[in-house]
Amino acid sequence: MTEKEKMLAHQWYDANFDKDLETERVRAKDLCFDFNQTRPSDDSRRQAILTELFGYTLENVAINSPFDTDYGWNVKLGKNVFVNSNCYFMDGGGITIGNDVFIGPSCGFYTAHHPLTPKERNAGLELAQPITIGNNIWFGGNVVVTPGVTIGDGSVIAAGSVVTKDVPPNSLVAGVPAKVIREINENDAPKN
């Protein structure tokens, strides 16, 4: 089994010293660099770079620069997704984002675990677990989502939260570590 196959099977793998994975990360970093150097008004060039990075054509997805990801091909973005500036997708474990999702500035989606023991950590071992984001979700700025987390449809993650556990649908979540504050319901709709 290759290190990439181990990564995709959510097993411990060599993240630092495997040449094939390193080559794929360098490819993604080069594409992110190119994307981040384009003018915001050059939409056709920016979309072409993102299509090459992710491996598919995006549907009404806006990503502000700077943006960074480890591989790109392991990120699945739904329709009508907005990613604000300075976001990082550590996508070794896979990141799936549903439709109609707003991601505030400086958010991080981290799929990698490292060993607690220094010998194994220094050997480059890593365990990647998926992050799954449902539909109609809003992330405030500076949110961190950790490996293996699923966030249910209709939820709001308050700015500065660190999400370490699954979030039920229609939940307002805040804090470090993030906790469910309450359920979101029709009474939360703006009134004139």
From Swiss-Prot:
Domain of life from the UniProt record: Bacteria
InterPro entries in UniProt: Hexapep, Hexapeptide_acetyltransf, Mac_dom, Trimer_LpxA-like_sf
EC identifiers of the protein: 2.3.1.-
Keywords: Acyltransferase, Repeat, Transferase
Any one GO MF annotation of this record: O-acyltransferase activity
Listed Pfam families: Hexapep_2, Mac
Record keyword Acyltransferase present: yes
Main enzyme class: transferase
GO cellular component: cytosol
The keyword Transport is assigned to this record: no
Family as reported in the entry's similarity comment: Belongs to the transferase hexapeptide repeat family.
The name this protein goes by in its record: Putative acetyltransferase SH0499
Organism: Staphylococcus haemolyticus (strain JCSC1435)
